[in-house]
Amino acid sequence: MDVVLEVTDQFMFDYMYAWLLPARPALYDFPDKTNGTAQAFSSWVYEPATKFFSLEPSQAAYQSIWTRDNIYRQALSLFLILWLFGLVTYYVFASLSYIFVFDKKTMEHPKFLKNQVWLEIKQTNAALPVMAFFTFPFLVAEVRGYSLLYDTTAEGPGRWYDFFQFPLFIMFTDFGIYWIHRGLHHPLVYKHLHKPHHKWIMPTPYASHAFHPIDGFAQSIPYHIFPFIFPLQKMAYVGLFVFINFWTIMIHDGEYYANNPVINGAACHSVHHFAFNYNYGQFTTLWDRLGGSYREPDGDMFAKEKKMSTTTWKKQVNEMEKIVKEVEGEDDRLYEPTETKKSK
């Protein structure tokens, strides 16, 4: 994450901290840009976060009492990156998925909630800053050199590992999330933490990050501990971070492209949302198969006409209502009236 921090420092945070916490109280005390003495204000020396590119700092990088290597500045910056950039990513890509991928006919489903899209967005807005608060200490530890992140192949285990790190990351995090997710379904935990995410029986892409914040943070822990246990290339880390967010949106978009026996895609995750106690995995079906919690999606889910048919919906509703009674007791969800759905 030091690469991301360097980029955001260069284009945003240097100017923000120079304005909020200036090294000198008055603007006229700043040295002229042409004399190159701005560095006299600070003992901090620029070192690129990666050998693949460098961004020569502007004068603003030296004009705050909180230099780039200040731990308090790093903590605040990383918190803001997680929260605000996470929010931007969520709105942009969940919206694109909602507009171009999500089948709006899903909103006619008997278990689609009243004002569901806005409720999903509201839940996400409330959750993201709290999730960011619990997450930023991991990133601070990373940028301060306590992780096993590496830059070039020569600094890592070798060329073979540059490729092996990707399946290793998927398998490790999938295993961790499986058990955390399954634990969140324990009766002593479910109603307090995981129930808010299961409010969405027929989720939209906006449900992707609509968690109780502790639930969302708990399921992200495997991602954040991985680089403290295994080596991980810095650029691969950033790419995987982006991929995780995309994947989370994709498995909530309701578009079932393929009935793959290995990949835990949108169809498998949709089964989890209406049948609750199956398909806890994030990326693959492996751990569900080994843990006895795998349920193959019905073939009808991959035929659009059948997927959206009254017969299929009725079958899902009957099963869902039975399971909700067992897991939650009374169903306190507020569903959209059928007449209203038909008029849309």
UniProtKB/Swiss-Prot annotation:
Its EC number is 1.14.19.20. It is found in: Endoplasmic reticulum membrane. A motif (Histidine box-2) lies at residues 194-198. This is Probable Delta(7)-sterol 5(6)-desaturase. It comes from the Eukaryota. Residues 167-292 form the Fatty acid hydroxylase domain. It is an enzyme of class 1 (oxidoreductase). A motif (Histidine box-3) lies at residues 269-273. It is a multi-pass membrane protein. Keywords: Endoplasmic reticulum, Iron, Lipid biosynthesis, Lipid metabolism, Membrane, Oxidoreductase, Steroid biosynthesis, Steroid metabolism, Sterol biosynthesis, Sterol metabolism, Transmembrane, Transmembrane helix. Belongs to the sterol desaturase family. Its cofactor is Fe cation. The histidine box domains may contain the active site and/or be involved in metal ion binding. May contribute to the regulation of ergosterol biosynthesis. Pathway: Steroid metabolism; ergosterol biosynthesis; ergosterol from zymosterol: step 3/5. The chain crosses the membrane at residues 76-96, 123-143, 160-180, 224-244. Signal peptide: none annotated. A motif (Histidine box-1) lies at residues 181-185. One of its GO terms (cellular component) is membrane. One of its GO terms (biological process) is ergosterol biosynthetic process. GO terms for molecular function: C-5 sterol desaturase activity; delta7-sterol 5(6)-desaturase activity; iron ion binding. It catalyses: a Delta(7)-sterol + 2 Fe(II)-[cytochrome b5] + O2 + 2 H(+) = a Delta(5),Delta(7)-sterol + 2 Fe(III)-[cytochrome b5] + 2 H2O. It holds the Pfam family FA_hydroxylase.
